[in-house]
Amino acid sequence: MIRVQKILYPTDFSSYSNQAYFHAISLAEKHGASLTILFVYTPDIVTPGAPDNEEQAKVYWQQQLEQIRPLDARIPVRHVLLEGDPASEIVRFGRDTGIDLIVMGTHGRTGLERLLLGSVAEQVLRDAACSVLVVKLPKGQPTTERGDVAVAGRN
């Protein structure tokens, strides 16, 4: 059994990503683990509602990130904003900080869409030095329902 003391929850603020949050919180409570909530900011991608100015955008994303808080105040939470390629930064951050488990959502893209856009979750599963739990929101399910779960472990 893997001892889980540090959990990383990377988010892109989508309903798919939010779905994994329930699992990250539950696991943090169960194992008495700390939780790091990570958003990787990509400056060359325009996001509706986010400022165009790079410095203002960083402030905006940091504010969005810090709004994510577990109801249980006993869970130690750290918010981290990084810049770069999401999959690479998630993997690097997990390795550099000794994360035991990454809990993340997936959009569940298939076919041409996946080929063109790639899969952050797939790259993290492939490259992470720790175990990864991927939560997929079933089609047509409201975001309050828990989704399907896939786990890949590393020793």
Please identify what each model-predicted range represents:
Residues 2-55, 140, 150-155:
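Small/aliphatic-rich secondary-structure junction motif
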Residues 1-2, 16, 70-102, 139-144, ...:
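Structural beta-alpha unit
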Residues 27, 33-34, 75, 99, ...:
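Short glycine/serine/threonine/alanine-rich loop segments
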Residues 23, 53-67, 89:
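Short, solvent-exposed amphipathic alpha-helices that sit
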Residues 20, 47-50, 89-92, 114-115, ...:
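Short, well-ordered secondary-structure micro-motifs
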Residues 17, 57, 117-121:
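Short, conserved glycine- and acidic-residue-centered signature motifs
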Residues 93-143:
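Gly/Ser-rich helix-loop-strand patches that form or flank binding pockets
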Residues 36-38, 78-82, 133:
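General small-molecule cofactor/ligand-binding pocket signal
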